[in-house]
């Protein structure tokens, strides 16, 4: 016979429970079919992690919160869809496969597009999506049979359809425009650029007038871009330069002339008051160039290599060219000075390459696409949790610029735009055979792919079958049943990358916002509040934490620390504490199991007959009401705190203790714990499942899972009985304090009395519990104060010990010894020494006086006790 473990061993049960529940289809839409209630629908989309990704602590937080909510709704009778999937992650995935090929001496350009994409698919099938398996370790109950991939056949069609619809409405256009350009990864949208503060330099360059005697000094952080200058600009009201407007200056190093122009854009008090205008390589200058009809000159190619506009510097890499340009300026006496300068430098979010403003012909989504979604958010048709995030959303949407959606990659959704030999351009959902305008069969598809966020922006409805032919991955009724989705849970860091785009993509195509509630959680940091990084050595690996503490402890900890709007400071101490919590529950169930073989499910308060059973169930019902309210309002931390306080602070610390007096209540306490485990299940699915079956004397292999049982709903309370037990608890605690105060060997307190501030119905019950749990032979309930007694004051009572028949001399001797010790400690402070007081540093004196204050307080309390004990 297998020996029962003495402590909770998560590794022995987690995999087994997960596999059984998954195999039975509990995670699927109809997994809870027997308890589904008509008209109740719940849908939550998993933010699709990158196919290259592995589970990190941020994923663990998002997935834990999502799964808690999904399990709650599933148990509460909702037809539930928790939609899983993976993102093709264009740049990231291409980089992974590219590196693998380079290690074999193969470049992607040598393979060509089709063969390279074939290699990516091979990699995806072999190594991609490891994160989905890792999610299972966390207990994530998502509908894995419906897993979608943003490059699967159906979603490719949905992407093309969205592009076609927006193209036909004029919301997608192709144009030459200033974009963020990574010389490695190509065009980036504004929010794919990360800005870092860098120490750089400000170069003051001389631009000579045509007379070659006078010059203007212009400051720049990017001297290599001077070859693209189209003008020098001054403020029209600047008296220093008014007379020069309209004249020409000579461009340093290459002797091309450019005009001096006037524009109110220039701040007269900044720098020299003169600025260079480089329309081809600066966002502001690009707009200035359009206003003044200046030439836009590109000085480097897509790889950042300087071109013929740069004279002798042609073929140098842009950043490498900087030092050589500066050296040439010095050599030709064209450099006035160099100053240290701290400024923000944009980097590619993926490869951290320095990003350049660059004019390029790209595809864009116009900002007008978002207008309707913005208006609906203002009308309150979707709510943000915490509510302050709507301010961030509004601020960003007000400044929305055209979204650059074309990317210079092989891997991704190839833009479905075709051009024939006669330059007719059209969009097609399928591969066309001929041009619809001129019937030419010589067609070429646009080589660029769409921004990864284009396809993930459709996630809320494309996964439900929108724009696709029939598939086993969705049902025909899914859009009707699950769109709009109910809730979105994700990190605030992708509010603009993903959430805002889903809002306007969904509203634009389906006429409704994609979800009703948007919960944005904070970031997980280390215990000091610092960002986790490998270089700091403070990264907490969720898989390692699951190995060490169990999935339940990690889930419960993350939910408990997820206070609304605050960053999460995670430490292994938190995980250890919640592993101990799991073990406490294990011990409570084991204790009950020793007393009785199995326990029934009792959902209603009126089924409980013993006073302790009714009290415990009444308290559970209050917690049920509060936990439901917390979950309905996304207060995950409040829900975990309520459960922890009830299960440890009440059930384990009090109800179990009370049962040692009222043994007949054991049966009903087992039923209360079973109901409480259902309440706990969404947070700690494994231990709740295991202990439920332990108390039922069943095995999951042959019984229904707790996860498809109804979530507790009963909220009826017996408030009178609850109050009576609160009074009893208060009396016991007070009596225990009294014993600690008085009991010094050989003194043993055998009798005490209790004075109540208000009457309770059953004083006999109070006396019975108090005698047993405070370990006294007799407890009397009185309405007067004994003449010679010491007392302790509680919230609902005052307890007394009669001193008449006690030999108090050992206690008096102990207290006097404590007074002597305190007197010596006071002398050590030296505050009686005038020289010390006169010469000691202020901080030392303050510390000594604070210590004296503490000692005097202790002395006063002890003296008060002595006076009481020595009274005649």
Curated annotation (Swiss-Prot):
It comes from the Bacteria. One of its GO terms (biological process) is valyl-tRNA aminoacylation. Its EC number is 6.1.1.9. Keywords: Aminoacyl-tRNA synthetase, ATP-binding, Coiled coil, Cytoplasm, Ligase, Nucleotide-binding, Protein biosynthesis. GO terms for molecular function: aminoacyl-tRNA deacylase activity; ATP binding; valine-tRNA ligase activity. Pfam families: Anticodon_1, tRNA-synt_1, Val_tRNA-synt_C. Residues 810-871 form a coiled coil. It catalyses: tRNA(Val) + L-valine + ATP = L-valyl-tRNA(Val) + AMP + diphosphate. InterPro entries: aa-tRNA-synth_I_CS, aa-tRNA-synth_Ia, Anticodon_Ia_Val, M/V/L/I-tRNA-synth_anticd-bd, Rossmann-like_a/b/a_fold, tRNA-bd_arm, tRNAsynth_Ia_anticodon-bd, Val-tRNA_synth_C_sf. SUPFAM superfamilies: Anticodon-binding domain of a subclass of class I aminoacyl-tRNA synthetases, Nucleotidylyl transferase, tRNA-binding arm, ValRS/IleRS/LeuRS editing domain. It is found in: Cytoplasm. A motif ('HIGH' region) lies at residues 49-59. Its main location: cytoplasm. Gene3D superfamilies: 2.170.220.10, HUPs (3.40.50.620), Isoleucyl-tRNA Synthetase, Domain 1 (1.10.730.10), Valyl-tRNA synthetase, C-terminal domain (1.10.287.380), Valyl/Leucyl/Isoleucyl-tRNA synthetase, editing domain (3.90.740.10). The keyword Cytoplasm applies. The keyword Transmembrane does not apply. A motif ('KMSKS' region) lies at residues 531-535. GO terms for cellular component: cytosol. ATP binds at residue 534. Monomer. ValRS has two distinct active sites: one for aminoacylation and one for editing. The misactivated threonine is translocated from the active site to the editing site. The C-terminal coiled-coil domain is crucial for aminoacylation activity. Catalyzes the attachment of valine to tRNA(Val). As ValRS can inadvertently accommodate and process structurally similar amino acids such as threonine, to avoid such errors, it has a 'posttransfer' editing activity that hydrolyzes mischarged Thr-tRNA(Val) in a tRNA-dependent manner. Belongs to the class-I aminoacyl-tRNA synthetase family. ValS type 1 subfamily. This is Valine--tRNA ligase. It comes from Helicobacter pylori (strain J99 / ATCC 700824) (Campylobacter pylori J99). The gene is valS.
């Amino acid at each position: 016979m297998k020996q029962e473990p003495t402590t909770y061993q998560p590794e022995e049960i987690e995999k087994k429970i997960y596999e059984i529940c998954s195999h039975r289809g509990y995670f699927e839409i109809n997994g809870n079919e027997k308890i589904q209630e008509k008209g109740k629908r719940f849908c939550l989309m998993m933010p699709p992690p990158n196919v290259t990704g592995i589970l990190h602590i941020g994923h663990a937080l998002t997935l834990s919160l999502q799964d808690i909510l999904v399990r709650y709704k599933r148990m509460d009778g909702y037809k539930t869809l928790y939609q899983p999937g993976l993102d093709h992650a264009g740049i990231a995935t291409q980089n992974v496969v590219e590196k693998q090929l380079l290690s074999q001496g193969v470049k992607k350009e040598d393979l060509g597009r089709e063969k390279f994409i074939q290699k990516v698919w091979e990699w995806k099938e072999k190594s991609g999506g490891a994160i989905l398996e890792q999610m299972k370790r966390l207990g994530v109950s998502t509908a894995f049979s419906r897993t979608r991939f943003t490059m699967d056949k159906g979603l490719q069609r949905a992407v093309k359809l969205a592009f076609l619809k927006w193209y036909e409405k004029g919301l997608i256009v192709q144009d030459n425009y200033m974009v963020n350009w990574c010389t490695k990864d190509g065009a980036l949208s504004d929010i794919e650029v990360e800005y870092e503060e860098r120490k750089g330099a400000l170069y003051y360059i001389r631009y000579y007038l045509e007379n070659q005697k006078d010059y203007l000094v212009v400051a720049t952080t990017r001297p290599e871009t001077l070859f693209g200058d189209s003008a020098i600009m001054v403020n029209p009201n600047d008296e220093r330069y008014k007379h020069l407007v309209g004249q020409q200056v000579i461009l340093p190093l290459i002797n091309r002339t450019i005009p001096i122009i006037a524009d109110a854009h220039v701040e007269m008090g900044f720098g020299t008051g003169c600025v260079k205008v480089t329309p081809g390589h600066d966002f502001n200058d690009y707009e200035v160039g359009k206003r003044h009809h200046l030439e836009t000159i590109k000085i480097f190619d897509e790889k950042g290599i300087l071109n013929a506009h740069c004279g002798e510097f042609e073929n140098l890499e842009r950043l490498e060219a900087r030092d050589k340009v500066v050296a040439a300026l010095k050599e030709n006496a064209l450099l006035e000075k160099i100053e240290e300068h701290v400024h923000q430098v944009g980097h590619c979010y993926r490869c951290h390459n320095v990003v350049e403003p660059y004019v390029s012909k790209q595809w864009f989504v116009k900002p007008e696409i978002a207008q309707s979604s913005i208006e609906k958010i203002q009308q309150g048709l979707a709510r943000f949790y915490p509510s302050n995030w709507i301010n961030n959303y509004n601020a960003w949407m007000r400044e929305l610029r055209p979204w650059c959606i074309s990317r210079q990659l092989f891997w991704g959704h190839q833009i479905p735009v075709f051009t024939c030999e006669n330059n007719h351009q059209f969009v097609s959902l399928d591969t066309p055979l001929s041009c619809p305008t001129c019937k030419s069969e010589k067609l070429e598809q646009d080589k660029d792919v769409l921004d990864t966020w284009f396809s993930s922006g459709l996630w809320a409805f494309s996964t439900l079958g929108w724009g696709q032919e029939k598939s086993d991955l969705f049902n025909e009724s899914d859009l009707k049943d699950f769109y709009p989705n109910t809730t979105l849970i994700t990190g605030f860091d992708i509010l603009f990358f993903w959430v805002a785009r889903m809002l306007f993509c969904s509203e634009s195509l389906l006429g409704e916002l994609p979800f009703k509630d948007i919960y944005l959680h904070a970031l997980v940091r280390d215990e000091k509040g610092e960002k986790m990084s490998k270089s700091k050595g403070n990264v907490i690996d969720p898989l390692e934490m699951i190995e060490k503490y169990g999935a339940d402890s990690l889930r419960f900890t993350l939910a408990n620390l997820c206070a609304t709007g605050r960053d999460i400071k995670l430490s292994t101490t938190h995980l250890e504490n919640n592993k101990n919590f799991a073990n406490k529950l294990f011990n409570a169930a084991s204790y009950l199991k020793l007393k009785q073989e199995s326990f029934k499910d009792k959902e209603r308060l009126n089924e409980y007959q013993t006073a302790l059973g009714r009290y415990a169930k009444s308290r559970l019902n209050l917690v049920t009401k509060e936990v439901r309210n917390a979950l309905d309002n996304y207060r995950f931390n409040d829900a975990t705190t309520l459960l922890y306080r009830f299960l440890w602070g009440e059930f384990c610390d009090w109800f179990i203790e009370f049962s040692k007096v009222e043994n007949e209540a054991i049966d009903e306490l087992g039923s209360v714990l079973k109901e409480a485990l259902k309440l706990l299940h969404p947070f700690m699915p494994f231990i709740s499942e295991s202990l439920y079956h332990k108390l039922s004397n069943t095995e999951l292999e042959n019984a229904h899972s707790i996860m498809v049982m109804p979530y507790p709903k009963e909220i009826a309370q017996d408030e009178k009985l609850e109050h009576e037990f609160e009074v009893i608890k208060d009396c016991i605690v007070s009596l225990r304090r009294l014993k600690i105060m008085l009991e010094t060997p050989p003194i043993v307190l055998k009798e005490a009395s209790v004075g109540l501030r208000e009457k309770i119905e059953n004083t006999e019950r109070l006396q019975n519990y108090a005698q047993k749990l405070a370990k006294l032979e007799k407890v009397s309930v009185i309405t007067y104060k004994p003449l010679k007694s010491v007392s302790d004051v509680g919230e609902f009572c005052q307890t007394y010990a009669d001193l008449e028949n006690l030999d108090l001399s050992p206690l008096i001797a102990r207290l006097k010894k404590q007074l002597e010790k305190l007197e010596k400690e006071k002398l050590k402070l030296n505050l009686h020494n005038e020289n010390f007081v006169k010469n000691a540093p202020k901080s030392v004196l303050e510390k000594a006086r604070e210590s004296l204050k503490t000692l005097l307080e202790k002395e006063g309390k002890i003296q008060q006790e002595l006076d009481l004990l020595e009274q005649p």
